């Protein structure tokens, strides 16, 4: 055990030592007799030689490392300063070059020029400079020479100049110029300076390229003579030619040596043939008037004609449309498919409604028919001399036309002219068998005329329809007898009335055919055999 005195003596010796290092104290637990905690320096346990050498070496290493860091920082600062100076110099030269290309007299003062330059090795920097430029021809000549010597391309000098200098972290230097110019041609030019030739450009120009490509793009424009005005379609023609070359090259890449498509999804494309080329050549004028181009040839063909010269549904066929001028069709001619069928259906309904209105206008009412029938029956029951005027009394002109029709119906094509039918009854003094009129009745019905018309002869429509009365003239042989009127046959009139009630009203056929409907059926008997029915 170490006593308290020995500990104090050791502390004194350690405190008188030459080592400047601050002593490190170690806590030691003391016995019960000594109260408190004593700290013993850790340096007293080691010799004084090795700590001095280690401290000196650490100082030298630290100083050397600090010197190296300072040198590196100085080099970096110098590089940054040098780069900043180069950037400022380049920007100043670009501003001078842009102001010295052209004079503001050639361009409008409200034009706009944007220059975006990329300098290698610097981050993106955008600066906007507004300047009013007044340049002389001498300065222009100097700047054009500097432009040829250096790698900087010139910009346009306008009334108000707006420059955007943008530098990117890449190795290529590029400039972007966006200029808005008036559309009218500028015939003026500076004859003394070659820089004036650079002012000839389209109204709006956007160019993004490197310096070498920038200079190469301006060479053909500089080669133009001074007095010649700029060509209107020069830029467009050049652009069109370039685009065609690019398209041809792309198609060549997509095909192999045999001319087949390389990609599997292009196999369904048909190869162009001579017929297709001729069709495309013929469709050229049609495509000029319509953006969508002409319709297919199948839709342009008119509907096929039926043997009777009518279209579908009894409607007259539409005029044919030329295949090459399909885009000029207007109105209903442009309808196809379901719309065309619906339009034809509407036209058919309109035609039927017109025919129905005409038939209602021409057809007398049922009351008039009843009056005519009653009048004819009264005239038939009267005296014999009154029988002949009974044909004209009920109806007037229509009755006369009916009688003339009944008399003018030909029995054979060889004998078209026949004597009028004698409706009067002869006296008793005339011997021999005679023919007398048995029944005169008006019968409305839609029955066809029993008279057979010869082929080649055209039927003349009489203007009567289904509900118009038919004049039926029936002649029966009468035996020779004395004077006296024949008794009217009421049974025949009853049969006619029953037949009138049972006869259905037939619907007129569709289409405007020349067949007459509702003509008077005339049955008569003459001395010679004819096509008419017999009693």
Swiss-Prot record:
Residues 201-212, 402-411 have a biased composition (Polar residues). The keyword Flavoprotein does not apply. InterPro entries: DUF4594 (IPR029336). Residues 289-300 have a biased composition (Basic residues). Residues 60-97 form a coiled coil. Residues 383-394, 509-518 have a biased composition (Low complexity). The modification Phosphoserine is found at residues 201, 393. Pfam families: DUF4594 (PF15266). Residues 175-233, 263-535 are annotated as: Disordered. Keywords: Coiled coil, Phosphoprotein. It comes from the Eukaryota. Residues 330-348 have a biased composition (Basic and acidic residues). This is Coiled-coil domain-containing protein 9B.
């Amino acid at each position: 055990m170490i006593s308290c005195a020995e500990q104090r003596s050791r502390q004194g010796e350690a405190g008188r030592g030459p080592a400047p290092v601050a002593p490190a104290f170690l806590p030691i637990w003391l016995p019960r007799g000594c109260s408190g905690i004593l700290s013993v320096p850790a340096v007293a346990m080691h010799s004084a030689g090795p700590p001095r050498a280690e401290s000196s070496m650490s100082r030298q290493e630290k100083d050397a490392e600090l010197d190296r860091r300072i040198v590196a920082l100085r080099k970096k600062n110098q590089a940054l300063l040098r780069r900043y100076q180069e950037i400022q110099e380049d920007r100043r030269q670009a501003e001078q070059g842009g102001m010295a290309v052209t004079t503001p007299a050639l361009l409008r003062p409200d034009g706009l020029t944007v220059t975006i330059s990329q300098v290698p090795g610097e981050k993106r920097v955008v600066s906007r400079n507004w300047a009013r430029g007044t340049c002389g021809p001498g300065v222009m000549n100097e700047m054009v020479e500097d432009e040829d010597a250096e790698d900087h391309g010139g910009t346009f000098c306008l009334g108000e100049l707006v420059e955007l200098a943008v530098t990117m972290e890449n190795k290529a230097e590029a400039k972007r110029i966006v200029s808005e110019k008036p559309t009218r041609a500028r015939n003026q030019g500076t004859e003394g300076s070659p820089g004036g030739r650079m002012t000839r450009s389209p109204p709006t120009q956007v160019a993004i390229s490197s310096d070498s490509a920038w200079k190469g793009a301006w060479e053909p424009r500089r080669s133009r003579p001074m007095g010649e005005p700029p060509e209107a379609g020069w830029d467009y023609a050049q652009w069109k030619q370039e685009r065609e070359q690019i398209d041809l090259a792309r198609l060549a890449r997509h095909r192999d040596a045999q001319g087949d498509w390389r990609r599997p999804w292009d196999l369904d494309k048909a190869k162009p043939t001579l017929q297709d080329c001729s069709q495309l050549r013929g469709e050229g004028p049609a495509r000029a008037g319509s953006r969508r181009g002409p319709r297919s040839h199948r839709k342009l063909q008119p509907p096929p004609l039926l043997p009777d010269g009518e279209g579908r549904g009894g409607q007259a066929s539409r005029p044919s449309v030329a295949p090459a001028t399909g885009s000029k069709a207007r109105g209903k001619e442009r309808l196809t498919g379901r719309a065309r069928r619906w339009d034809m259906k509407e036209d058919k309904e309109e035609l039927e409604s017109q025919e129905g209105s005409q038939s209602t206008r021409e057809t007398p009412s049922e009351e008039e028919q009843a009056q005519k029938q009653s009048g004819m029956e009264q005239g038939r029951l009267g005296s014999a001399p009154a029988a002949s005027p009974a044909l004209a009394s009920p109806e007037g002109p229509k009755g006369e036309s009916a009688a003339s029709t009944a008399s003018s119906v030909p029995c054979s094509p060889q004998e078209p002219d026949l004597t009028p039918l004698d409706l009067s009854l002869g006296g008793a003094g005339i011997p021999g068998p005679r023919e007398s009129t048995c029944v005169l009745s008006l019968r409305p019905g839609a029955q066809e005329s029993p008279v057979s018309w010869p082929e080649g002869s055209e039927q003349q429509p009489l203007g009567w329809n289904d509900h118009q009365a038919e004049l039926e003239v029936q002649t029966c042989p009468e035996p020779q007898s004395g004077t006296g009127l024949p008794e009217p046959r009421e049974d025949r009139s009853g049969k006619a009335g029953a037949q009138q009630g049972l006869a259905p009203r037939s619907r007129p056929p569709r289409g405007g055919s020349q067949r007459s409907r509702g003509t008077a059926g005339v049955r008569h008997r003459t001395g010679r055999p004819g096509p008419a029915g017999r009693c």
